[in-house]
UniProtKB/Swiss-Prot annotation:
Disulfide bond positions: none
Similarity comment: Belongs to the UPF0102 family.
Source species taxonomy: Bacteria, Pseudomonadati, Pseudomonadota, Betaproteobacteria, Burkholderiales
Organism: Bordetella avium (strain 197N)
NCBIfam families xref list: PRK12497.1-3, YraN family protein
Stretches that traverse the bilayer: none
InterPro entries (UniProt xref): Restrct_endonuc-II-like, tRNA_endonuc-like_dom_sf, UPF0102_YraN-like
Domain of life where this protein originates: Bacteria
Name this polypeptide is given: UPF0102 protein BAV3162
Gene3D superfamilies the UniProt entry points to: 3.40.1350.10
Gene Ontology terms, MF aspect: nucleic acid binding
Length: 145
């Protein structure tokens, strides 16, 4: 295992340039959202259900932001790449994150920050969280009082 890690550290395996571009878009998106007054709580929060790019506060609302980057609008573009299956994974990951968070009682919103051809598009409330997440948040609020 140590050899493999040494091999990777030396840079003999080239990183995927799309991954680097996605990270740049995420950093740019974070700056944009902070400029709009949102406060960062977590970045790249991972759990058994997946990864949440950005978890932020917009006033009293907890916002889960999925950042997507595409070089063009082929195949529907960046925002269209977040279909029902991805939305469900994000919702499950958010529910898991909320379960262990002091923010469990807050209202939840899912936003998408889509970058296409250098342009950013912020879709507030891009999709509704499933009812089970809302009910988990309310139950957690009751337990914390």
């Amino acid at each position: 295992m140590r050899r493999l890690l040494d091999f990777l550290r030396r840079g003999l395996i080239r990183p995927d340039p799309r991954h680097a571009q996605g990270k740049r878009a995420e950093a740019q998106g974070l700056r944009l959202l902070r400029a709009q007054g949102l406060r960062l709580l977590a970045r790249n929060a991972r759990n058994r259900h997946g990864e949440l790019d950005l978890i932020m506060l917009d006033g009293e609302v907890l916002v889960v932001v999925e950042v997507r980057w595409r070089s063009g609008s082929a195949f529907g573009g960046a925002a269209a790449s977040i279909g029902p299956a991805k939305q469900a994974r994000l919702a499950r990951a958010a529910a898991c994150w909320l379960a262990g968070s002091e923010h469990a009682g807050r209202r939840l919103r899912f936003d998408v920050l889509a970058f296409e051809a250098g342009q950013a598009r912020w879709l507030r409330g891009a999709f509704e969280p499933p009812a089970y997440i809302a009910s988990q948040a309310l139950r957690a609020r009751g337990r914390r009082r």
